[in-house]
Amino acid sequence: MKRERNNSLDPLEISEWRWSEFLDDAIKALELFDIEPYPIPEEFLTKEETIKFKNNQIKVKALTWACRTTKIRQARAACIEAGPAASVLNLVINPFHNFELPFFGADFVTLPSGHLLALDLQPVLKKDEIHNQKVWSKLIPIHDHWQSLLPSGGPIPQEAETFFSPGFLWTRLPLDDQGSKLISKVIRPAFQEYLTLYIDLISDAQEVSKERSLEILSGQKAYINYRAEKDPARGMLARFFGKDWTEQYIHKVLFDL
């Protein structure tokens, strides 16, 4: 019997979803803190449709898991399963602006053309040494190890560079056994190591001054506004669930600051 989801912490039921173990890793890590549900409107907790794909009817499903803590404003996972059309985990952890913390970002996308996989602790104030020094000194060695085992994902848009750190792990992998092996043997342990570092940063974070928190908030808003405007999943989501639902999901859930 299918269970209804009443809040954003309720379990997700997605049959044969490629990224389930990654989400389990994230939830387990976040449960080290006292988490509570993040308020997600009911229409975005679970969404199902049937669409036409290559002359076949397929079911597509979108589910949202989200929480908050005393230091995390919103940690949310957007989970999409569309069989041969797409399989997606987009995880963003957004800290409160009164802590000197980056964003955590993981974007794992499987499409008919291959896997697009990105992972980073994204700076709020990229040109600010105080904001980045402690993070990058620990992140870059982790990145360099795992990125050396993966092909490069290619260049990123110049306008987006300000929102990525030198520890941005980015790769494209084929839809074959080798790609699946790299996801299991490289991407997942890299994800776990990035996540462990981020959880440690949260644990150690102390409140900053009001003046500093306003600088951080300004940087967070710049990132959130950019992501909402340029979200590369917009077209896919609109094809699956319609333009109106997609725009509301992007602005009310995914990037709601």
UniProtKB/Swiss-Prot annotation:
Enzyme Commission (EC) number: 1.3.7.3
Single biological process term from Gene Ontology: phytochromobilin biosynthetic process
Reactions that this protein is recorded to catalyse: (3Z)-phycoerythrobilin + oxidized 2[4Fe-4S]-[ferredoxin] = 15,16-dihydrobiliverdin + reduced 2[4Fe-4S]-[ferredoxin] + 2 H(+)
Protein's UniProt keywords contain Oxidoreductase: yes
Ribosomal protein listed as a keyword: no
InterPro entries in the record: Ferredoxin-dep_bilin_Rdtase (IPR009249), Phycoerythrobilin_Fdx_Rdtase (IPR022827)
Record keywords: Oxidoreductase
First-level EC class: oxidoreductase
An annotated Gene Ontology molecular function: cobalt ion binding
Biological role: Catalyzes the two-electron reduction of the C2 and C3(1) diene system of 15,16-dihydrobiliverdin.
Family: Belongs to the HY2 family.
Protein name (record): Phycoerythrobilin:ferredoxin oxidoreductase
Source species of the chain: Prochlorococcus marinus (strain MIT 9211)
